[in-house]
């Protein structure tokens, strides 16, 4: 299994890094037989239940772009599309066993997700699949997996630079279509919503330094780390 050829300069030296095209990090990885068996031959059988249910209250996947990708059947997009369709089927599926975490569909989706993280972690399909799996885990109370999956999705969004288009290093060049740009942005919004929910137990109103040092040492430490006074600190969300 070939690993993703990620541009190392993105992390090592942002000044010399140049944004790459969206196809630069694509892969020709084949769809596993077990995934094909779970999806079947009719993609519409997966899409229709999703867009008539989940998409009505959590819209972040473009139906038009998805249909275009299915019809194009591009070799570099097939693996990512299969992952996304599998995760769409997962969130619309009602497990028939008592333990949702042990369902075949969930275990296969998690396994394929881990595989695609190695071969094509920066694709939009992978990003969206993480959001769907996190949504499923939150909805079925699968913890701490839900917490960890949301963290993975958040880090992918940060790597792509969606959180700050002006100041953050942009991994990819500006997309050719407005539709892609909007879909990517909505996926980040979906991630942010899940992040606020999954991280709720870790919210604290203040960040305290527990130590026996004298106060002048604490003042110096606060200045060194650029921490504002306690009275000015807002609620912090920790990943």
Task: Annotate each language-model stretch with its function.
Residues 1-54, 157, 211, 239:
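Intrinsically disordered, low-complexity activation-like regions
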Residues 37, 45-239:
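Acidic, Ser/Thr-rich, low-complexity intrinsically disordered regions in fungal proteins
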């Amino acid at each position: 299994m070939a690993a993703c050829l990620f541009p190392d300069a993105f992390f090592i030296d942002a000044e010399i890094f140049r944004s790459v095209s969206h196809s630069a990090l694509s892969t020709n990885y084949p769809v596993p037989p077990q995934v094909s068996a779970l999806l079947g031959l009719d993609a519409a059988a997966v899409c229709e239940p999703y867009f008539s249910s989940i998409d009505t209250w959590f819209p972040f996947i473009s139906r038009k772009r998805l249909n275009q990708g299915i019809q194009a059947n591009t070799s570099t997009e097939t693996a990512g599309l299969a992952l996304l369709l599998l995760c769409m089927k997962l969130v619309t599926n009602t497990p028939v066993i008592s333990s949702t975490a042990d369902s075949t569909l969930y275990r296969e989706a998690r396994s394929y997700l881990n595989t695609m993280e190695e071969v094509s972690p920066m694709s939009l399909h992978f990003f969206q699949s993480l959001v769907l799996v996190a949504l499923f885990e939150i909805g079925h109370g699968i913890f701490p997996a839900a917490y960890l999956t949301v963290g993975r999705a958040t880090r992918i969004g940060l790597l792509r630079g969606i959180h700050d288009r002006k100041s953050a290093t942009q991994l990819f060049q500006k997309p050719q279509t407005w539709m892609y740009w909007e879909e990517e942005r909505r996926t980040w919004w979906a991630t942010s919503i899940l992040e606020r929910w999954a991280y709720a137990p870790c919210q604290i109103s203040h960040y305290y330094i527990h130590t026996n040092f004298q106060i002048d040492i604490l003042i110096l430490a606060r200045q060194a780390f650029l921490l504002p006074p306690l009275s000015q600190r807002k609620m912090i969300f920790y990943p």
